[in-house]
Regions:
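Active-site mouth loops of central-metabolism enzymes
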Residues: 8-23, 75-92, 144-146
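Metal-associated gating/positioning segment near the N- to mid-region
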Residues: 1-54
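Glycine-rich, aromatic-flanked loop segments that form ligand/cofactor-binding clefts
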Residues: 44-72, 188
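Histidine/acidic residue-rich metal-binding segments in metalloenzymes
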Residues: 88-109, 113-187, 208-229
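N-terminal small/glycine-rich loop or linker at the start of catalytic domains
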Residues: 1-10, 61-80, 131-132
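Non-cysteine beta-strand/loop elements that form the S-adenosyl-L-methionine
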Residues: 1, 64-69, 102-110, 185-193
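Active-site environment of divalent metal-dependent phosphoester hydrolases
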Residues: 2-4, 45-49, 71-72, 111-115, ...
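His/Asp/Glu-enriched, well-ordered alpha-helical/loop segment
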Residues: 140, 203, 212-274
């Protein structure tokens, strides 16, 4: 909710003096007009998502938020989330999220795609044993877990640990896809964060095309396995404004005539888990 798809620094500054309720209401109204009745937020440390949750009922929307994502000190996510230095501190933060009435826990366990270089992430994922502990601790507190995760081994480790959903999931292989399917992980591939970059001139067009092709091939393979796929735009990411429906077009392109059934099944599982 905090980001706007254009300028992340400006978007964050919008709430520097407190949550801009006018902005939040404008975004909620956008989704209401589009017919959305359920939104799952990625969280932020300025309480923008929390404010959105408190207002969403006025717009006929069920709104779920982790309040803020949790990220390891020195790794990706600190610009928007809360940082922990060790597992003990993370566990205390998870307990605090329970006291603050978070709906679920979001963990940041990998870097981003480098959109100028196919196959490259901005940093490696966290160690598998750390990923397992992060998910276990949150589950023990009764939370579902959303994971920002890219890279085959990172996603495989998260799925094997029982993560409830994976957001993004770039550069997966058969083992990672199979792990998600076998463990009931819902994959939210956020294709629009890649596809919407085409033609903008911001990144290498050849690399963007290759990244998108790879992601779409994996979505098709996962669907063929019977895996759970849900639509989610990562709204607020660069070139993905709130209300953008390009994610649905991209998923329909991959999934064909079965798209509605596949996505409805995945979305229902998201709502059940979260």
């Amino acid at each position: 909710m905090v980001l706007d798809g254009a300028d992340w620094k400006r978007a964050i500054a919008r709430h520097s003096g407190g949550v801009d309720e006018v902005w939040v209401r404008r975004v909620l109204e956008t989704y209401r007009k589009l017919g959305f009745t359920y939104l799952r937020d990625g969280g932020d440390r300025w309480s923008v998502g929390a404010k959105a949750r408190s207002l969403a009922g006025e717009y006929g929307i069920t709104y779920r938020t982790p309040l803020s994502p949790l990220c390891a000190q020195g790794h990706y996510g600190g610009f928007i989330g809360e940082k922990y230095e060790n597992l003990s501190q993370y566990a205390a933060m998870v307990s605090q999220k329970r006291a603050e009435d978070a709906d679920f826990i979001k963990i940041m366990i990998s870097g981003l795609m480098d959109f100028d270089r196919f196959g490259v992430l901005t940093e490696d994922g966290l160690p598998p044993e750390t990923i397992r502990e992060l998910i276990h601790i949150a589950h023990e507190e009764g939370f579902a877990v959303m994971a920002h995760a890219n890279g085959a081994r990172t996603v495989e480790a998260a799925a094997q640990a029982g993560v409830d959903s994976v957001e993004h999931g770039a550069y997966l292989d058969t083992d990672a896809l199979r792990a998600m399917r076998e463990n009931g992980t819902v994959w939210v591939p956020t294709l629009s964060t890649i596809g919407n970059l085409r033609g903008t001139g911001r990144f290498d067009e050849t690399a963007v095309a290759a990244i998108l092709e790879s992601a779409m091939e994996n979505v098709a393979a996962f669907a063929a396995m019977g895996g759970l796929i849900a639509p989610g735009t990562d709204a607020g990411a660069w070139a993905v404004p709130h209300g953008s429906l390009s994610e649905y077009a991209l998923l329909e392109q991959v999934l064909g005539e079965n798209a509605e059934n596949i996505l409805s099944r995945g979305a229902a599982e998201i709502q059940r888990k979260f």
